């Protein structure tokens, strides 16, 4: 069983998962939500899809408040009973139990088999959810994706909105950004959308609509070359690169000109 926060599965987590898979046993991971880390990189549904793509057999989702006062020894015993865990895999900085007193050495002292992996660094920075969040806050999408090992994404159902995009020739799929999901830096992004098993290049505005004097933060995506109704469909929007800041244009025509430039930039290699 792989142990860690597993707010998604970044390249450091992938090392733990691969080690767990190398044992030839059923592979499970333990994830913890809540606590000091605040908002998560991914929702529970998004994490489920990530874990499935990594070949995880099951995930045990725990709330920090439920386990924070559990002594380390009791916590390991809980995992053994709950998941029939026989082999543990964790990073050398893994801490658990009341007061974060449990360490990999604690697991060994209990007579359990445990594989301990070294901390992974990107330059001078420790690879982890905190570093990825800092990248998202600054719009450094390419670095965030390198640390994740896959594109950061939003998954959800398309809802009806005012239809302003369609009125100016750029229809958009609007997906509510979950309250529990860590926010990006506001701006316009190059994205990829997967719908009905097909991939579409796209541009996504995450933020307000200043040209229309609307300060509500939205996530609206224009799928290039898509024809059809997206309302009610479940989409995955992958963020590739930040194209520009969100800004107020002096007219709708100026906004359309900029959107056309954005589309040309995204499709320049086609």
Predicted regions and their residues:
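N-terminal catalytic cores of NTP/NDP-binding nucleotidyl/phosphoryl-transfer enzymes
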Residues: 1-49
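Residues at the starts of beta-strands that form the adenosine-phosphate
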Residues: 25-28, 57-58, 86, 113
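Phosphate/ribose-recognition catalytic cores of enzymes acting on nucleotide-derived substrates
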Residues: 161-270
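Classical nucleotidyltransferase
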Residues: 70-172, 194-195, 250-254
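Generic structural signal for residues in well-ordered beta-strands
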Residues: 59, 114-116, 237
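A conserved beta-strand->alpha-helix junction
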Residues: 57-67
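Structural recognition of alpha->loop->beta junctions
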Residues: 52-58, 139
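Glycine-rich, highly charged phosphate/nucleotide-binding loops
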Residues: 40-47, 68-76
């Amino acid at each position: 069983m792989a142990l860690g926060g597993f707010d998604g599965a970044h390249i450091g987590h992938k090392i733990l998962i691969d080690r767990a898979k190398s044992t030839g046993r059923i592979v499970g991971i333990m994830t913890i939500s809540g606590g000091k880390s605040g908002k998560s990189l991914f929702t529970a549904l998004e994490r489920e899809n990530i874990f499935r793509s990594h070949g995880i057999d099951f995930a045990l989702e725990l709330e920090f408040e439920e386990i924070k006062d559990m002594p380390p020894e009791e916590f390991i015993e809980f995992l053994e009973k709950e998941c029939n865990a026989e082999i543990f895999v964790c990073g050398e900085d893994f801490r658990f139990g009341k007061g974060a007193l449990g360490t990999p050495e604690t697991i060994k002292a209990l007579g359990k088999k445990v594989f301990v992996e070294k901390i992974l660094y990107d330059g001078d920075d420790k690879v982890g959810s905190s570093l990825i969040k800092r990248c998202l806050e600054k719009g450094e999408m390419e670095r965030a994706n390198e640390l994740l090992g896959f594109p950061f994404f939003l998954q959800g159902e398309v809802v009806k909105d005012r239809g302003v995009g369609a009125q100016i020739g750029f229809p958009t799929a609007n997906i509510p950004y979950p309250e529990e999901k860590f926010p990006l830096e506001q701006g316009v992004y190059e994205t990829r959308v997967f719908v009905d098993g097909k991939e579409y290049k796209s541009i996504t505005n995450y933020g307000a609509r200043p040209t229309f004097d609307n300060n509500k933060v939205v996530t609206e995506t224009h799928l290039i070359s898509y024809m059809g109704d997206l309302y009610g469909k479940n989409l995955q929007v992958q963020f590739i690169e930040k194209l520009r800041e969100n800004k107020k244009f002096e007219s709708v025509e100026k906004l359309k000109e900029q959107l056309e430039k954005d589309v040309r930039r995204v499709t320049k290699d086609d």
